[in-house]
Amino acid sequence: QQMYRDGHVNRREFLAAMGALGVTAATAGSFLTSASALASTPTRGGSVIFASNLHGPDDTLDPILGTSTIDYTRANAGCNGLIQVWTDMSLHGELAEEWSVNSNATEYTFKLRKGVTFHDGSAFSADDVLWSMNRHLGKDAPSSIKGFFAAVVEWTKIDSHTVKLSLSSPDADMPIKLTQFQAKIVKKDTTDFSKGAGTGPYLVEAFQPGVKSVHVRNPNYWRDTGQHLDAIEIMAITDPNARLNALLAGDIDMMTVL
């Protein structure tokens, strides 16, 4: 809330950040209406400490393996998807600049954004999309949302920045399914996710599963919005009373589950 008052984020970015951290729209709205001043022009700077309600040794920076709120938060900090949903529930292209669908919703074509780089400086391309999305396919896939993609026949590379998705049956909801955090795009052939493997607004500075992670602003992020904070620390306080007391004492800035 203080970041909003001080102009580090605007209304849309504040609501988006709260949503990424698992805070409901109603709760986020109450923060906004209680703020003493509304920020018209966001400024950069500051940091946030966010406390989730659970964590453990299975905490992961690999989006496809994520199952918890804390995994969700870290995936949103470090990665982008093909499509994203805004706080007004409308769908917009993210790593996909645009997409089209045939008349019976069995074939989607995605035009990918150019000039995007991963955190290690390598260029994002169609190869990364195919590798990331193919990880969801098959009965032995590690994905917790592989059922969403049961009708996928194949992902096809048309050119370096165009991919086609072919389905065995109509699915008009596929764009919504692609907004799931497990469907974030990661660099092709990544095996070590401890330093992150995404194109997102924040780099991984430190990651200790079951303890905390620290994320710092990506200086080469392809967007000019969505990363006004210098750093985000993500941890968990499993006891609800301790979590609330930490918030009231100012030891943390945000939390899930009152």
Locate predicted features.
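C-terminal segment of N-terminal export signals and the immediately downstream linker at the start
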Residues: 8, 29-54
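N-terminal secretory signal peptides
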Residues: 1-13
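N-terminal export signals
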Residues: 13-36
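Gly/Pro-rich hinge or "lid" segments in bacterial periplasmic/extracellular proteins
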Residues: 85-90, 171, 176-233, 239-241
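Short, well-ordered beta-strand elements
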Residues: 45-54, 107-109, 129-132, 163-164, ...
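Aromatic- and charge-enriched surface segment that lines or borders ligand/interaction sites
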Residues: 98-142, 164, 246
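N-terminal lobe/hinge region of extracytoplasmic solute-binding protein
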Residues: 51-103, 134, 197-199
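Surface-exposed binding/hinge segments that line
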Residues: 111, 145-187
